[in-house]
């Protein structure tokens, strides 16, 4: 709302409805997928580092099984949660085809410890991106943008800078998984 009545930098045009479009693109098309994939990569890394007990790595298939086991009546909130969470997990899995192939190979190989160590060595440098693409950096940039009354900076930062980090992180992680799959 704050951006709505402000002028677009270096022009005499007000943001108006453009502010809603800009913020919607930043939030729905950039922030949401970036955060979900960053979370997924972090959970994958923790899974390979600490095992199932040290990670919250969930699968679409497991969430659907839980959903199907719930009673049809009297479990509205549970069904709503697991339905949405299953979709969330499915979106993560669909965006990581190389990891899915690698993970199936690793599971089928009696959980090869050398392969696990190689994965962790390749995944560790990408963890800085998972941390940057979650809350802290966003909060700092949003805070600075609001304090300086240059709120347009935040959605553009989200769309340009954070998306570039996301693309790099995603590409590198998938390449790592493809190398290890061979």
Model-derived features: where do they sit?
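Multi-pass membrane catalytic core of lipid/isoprenoid biosynthesis enzymes
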Residues: 1-34
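C-terminal membrane-associated helical module and adjoining short loops/tails
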Residues: 30-182
